[in-house]
């Protein structure tokens, strides 16, 4: 029974689904056909219970009731039952109320009033279909009623009056102001699209501004705006909607534009010349006014003038200032003029503005000068002091009557009219703070009236100041002068001269004086005080050092006493108050310049040293000292004793050295230095460990039989010569000359012999190494002979910088299709470029546009097969080659390294130009098991001579197709034999002429060297020395005979 219930339920659900799918909500919209004048109903069916959105529209401001009903809604459920339709939303149950109504039975929607789009641009009506129980039979439907816009709103400007400023002479298209207007009509509609237009301009004339039709931006039309012509413009701007159409609405606004002033006008003076007069010795705060004319706006820096005196004011008598109210220049006299010096003064006045000129006229400005003549009027002048102040100095040490009688000096006035000393004047002391001075009323002599204190408060920095007045008896004019008196400082520790009396000869007299320095004021300055003309003319004093001087005279003195006043000043320019007197007694002298009647036993004249003892001798006038000293017996004995001690001193030293060492006592034993210490001198006479003996005498190479297998004897001798070396970070910096001679014999297949000769020079930094025990005498002799041999060879060698001509340059390939072998290029190994000579490597770098790293010097071992079975027929290959070598030698001077050098070698490669004998045909044995028609491409570093045997490849690649076999030979300390029984079955087969192969394609590329059979150490005794061979590559093609 359960399945029956389930079946019934499923059938019921299926029935409901079918019923729901087939139901529909129909909306009918009534539209008016304007062209035909008919009204039609359009039915919109909603399938699958989906409501269609209502798209009806109404025009604002119109009576739309003639279009009722504007819409009709209907549900397909009304077929089976009674449905009531209801609507809600704005215009129905929300403001504005009562706009729309609906027939609940038929679903017709009517509009009942006029609508305004600016208030409600869109009405949303919610429609419902209800059954008798008030239940929704459908989901509510939302209808949108759009209100169509009409042009019922004019544009409105944001401001009624716009105010803007712009500078005169502005560039064209300069923005002045931007106008803005709004329209309440629908956005992005023609009814709200506003167009701007200038209706009028005041003052009238040429249009100066323009307005953008769409943006409302007001801009200048040209750069002719001039504030001096019109300082204000009024514009009437209109804004019209509907893009300025005639049927559009519009409004207007005012735009007031003020033209701002710029400094584009040059100021000029009102007159072309000016003149004025002034009495001499007078000042004036306003001698003359100069009016400047400027067309710029008054009261601004563009209008305010700036005056300057261009010329004529050499004495700085005048100044000129600007009156900011009137813009006049006021010429002032700031320094008294003198008619006698300048009766007429001619000035040049220039004017400009305080503000910088506008860039449009700045380059046109030139300052013009206006002449101004100033006439100086002569007047009766009184006395004057010239200079206005005078300085007097007071000698130190003056006291009492000497101070009262001392005349400081004379300070008189002059008559300004004549320039001579004034006559009808009297002098009086003016300002005198200490009342110390007095002046003669007629002569102007100034003296002290009383004594004063050196440390008085009226003395400032050693200067006492007072004033003196000169009064004209006739006019009563008064002139004032300033007196400055230098008061010397009181020195409590003044330098004192030794005052003992001294005797001098009457002719060519001189004496040395000394100063007692109590205050450490040296060095001292000496001078003879000019108390009388005789003293100053006769005596002269010269300083010897800081504390002494020599007093001399060149005249002949009269016998008698002399008093010479000398003033001594210390390093601070301080001296005693009174000059010091040196007492001298002039007397007649004998031939030895000794005073005849003086109590002094001896005196030196003509020299700077004065001595009061006669044991030292005398000095003549020509400066030759005549000694009065005699050698007594005691002196002679001391000299003999000194000589004896000097002779006995070596014997005394010898006795001290031969004395036996005491068994005990401090310093009698020495600690022995242990053997092997750093300070021990070794018997091998070099630093470091004991040298190792080596046998290097085997320089002969035994011959090897043709059938001998795996036997290669070698020997090699190298010598190293270093020069100019210095230790740098554990290495030796200098020049290395490596010379090596090696011989080797060996057997390869049918046999081959060769000789290796090497020479290389290395300049650079070499590592430090331990010297070995070699027979240096033998090596020196050997390499000396080799050096001479090389020198002879170099002399006989042709120049290597010219074109070499050979007898046979070769011929073209007999095979015409040799150019077709370009396909081999792709398979060639280009690594040989890395081992090119530096000159060729530079060319390769230029061609390849890349930098080629030098090929590393590594050690390689090349096997040599010496005993291979003959497994097949013999093939003969004719090969010939030539080898061209060149040699370049140079000598480099040693230079000190500017900075530590890294370890490394600089290799100088030597090449030679020789010719070898003709190469005989060689026999190469190939394995018969390998099929014929095999191409062998061989890259040869240098021709191989007298080589017979098989050229073999490793056994593991013997049966491999497309094999590329490269073989490189690099100098190495040990090269084993090339023979190997393991690869005997991988020998190369015959070669066909023309380069065309049949059968297995085995391509073998081999690089060979002339020393390929040498099995020996090719290095040098220096661990940092490396040899490089720079050879050329050549291609050798084998052909079958």
From Swiss-Prot:
Its main location: membrane. Residues 50-634 are extracellular. One of its GO terms (molecular function) is calcium ion binding. GO terms for cellular component: desmosome; plasma membrane. Residues 1-23 form the signal peptide. The keyword Protease does not apply. It holds the Pfam family Cadherin. One of its GO terms (biological process) is BMP signaling pathway. It is a single-pass type I membrane protein. Residues 656-1041 are cytoplasmic. It comes from the Eukaryota. Residues 50-157, 158-269, 270-385, 389-497 form the Cadherin domain. The chain crosses the membrane at residues 635-655. It is linked to Defects in Dsg4 are the cause of an autosomal recessive phenotype lanceolate hair (lah). Lah mouse pups develop only a few short hairs on the head and neck which form a lance head at the tip and disappear within a few month. They have thickened skin and do not exhibit any growth retardation. A component of desmosome cell-cell junctions which are required for positive regulation of cellular adhesion. Coordinates the transition from proliferation to differentiation in hair follicle keratinocytes. Plays a role in moderating lymphocyte migration to inflamed skin and maintaining homeostasis of the epidermal inflammatory response. Interacts with JUP. This is Desmoglein-4. It comes from Mus musculus (Mouse).
